[in-house]
Amino acid sequence: MTILPISAFSDNYIWAFIDKIAGVLDCVDPGEAAPIIRFAQSNQLTLRTILLTHHHYDHIGGVDSLIKQWPSCKVYGPIDERINNVTHPIKQGQSVQVGSLHFHILFNPGHTSTHISYYEPQKGWLFCGDTLFSAGCGRVFDGTIEELHESLLLFKKLPRNTKVFCAHEYTLQNLKFAHTVEPCNSSVINYMQQILKQPSPCTLPSNIDLELSINPFLRTDKEQVKQYALSHGANSSDSLDVFKVLRNQKNSFK
């Protein structure tokens, strides 16, 4: 099985699992249908499964057209009335089998109130939608900042070699903010230089080990990150207070 990012809109990735022997394709968060249809038809594949992380249109907008094209396609997603056409509603603690893959469902509210992620422990793969980005994290929409903080603490506990398949290409801009927070962090500086030199614009998947060294939202216990937060209005150096300031500062960062 092969995993590929299929680009959608300006910076979305629809992660696709391709099994050419079986002639099937599975995908995560198809915000657009056309890129998936083109890819499937050009590679003579049938869409078997759709995995959804949350209700935002750039993640679910292609579902209607895709299930019209492939009526037998299974659609997994969180229990949320804002998401239509989910054939298999799922929640924390359940598992989903996609071919030979067995995903554990993680409840990760914060970005939205019902956000979930798909974690495959045998492969070490995490499909985290808009909860975690490389060097960053999602904004808070209809979830809470406390929930988002807890969701990222959960990710910190995953094995360090876990590959992180985020839904957007935000890495370079996130690294610029990370450098503002920790100007002396050599991991941030070196990684920024690395991706500026690479020929491909795609910086994903990341991994938990890398994120623990470059992502300020996973580094709220580090002294320089705490000092940045305190100098920008944090009430204390408590992890949640630091996290709140980081998210607020990132919201207006240019």
From Swiss-Prot:
Pathway connected to this protein: Secondary metabolite metabolism; methylglyoxal degradation; (R)-lactate from methylglyoxal: step 2/2
Annotated residues for binding of Zn(2+) 1: 54, 56, 111, 130
Keywords (A to Z) from UniProt: Hydrolase, Metal-binding, Zinc
SMART domains listed in its UniProt record: Lactamase_B (SM00849)
Catalytic activity: an S-(2-hydroxyacyl)glutathione + H2O = a 2-hydroxy carboxylate + glutathione + H(+)
SUPFAM superfamilies: Metallo-hydrolase/oxidoreductase
CDD domains: hydroxyacylglutathione_hydrolase_MBL-fold
GO biological process, one term: methylglyoxal catabolic process to D-lactate via S-lactoyl-glutathione
Keyword Metal-binding: yes
Single GO MF annotation: hydroxyacylglutathione hydrolase activity
Note on how the cofactor is bound: Binds 2 Zn(2+) ions per subunit.
Binding site for Zn(2+) 2: 58-59, 130, 168
Top-level taxon: Bacteria
PANTHER family: HYDROXYACYLGLUTATHIONE HYDROLASE (PTHR43705), HYDROXYACYLGLUTATHIONE HYDROLASE GLOB (PTHR43705:SF1)
Protein name stated in the entry: Hydroxyacylglutathione hydrolase
Species whose genome carries this gene: Legionella pneumophila (strain Corby)
Gene (name only): gloB
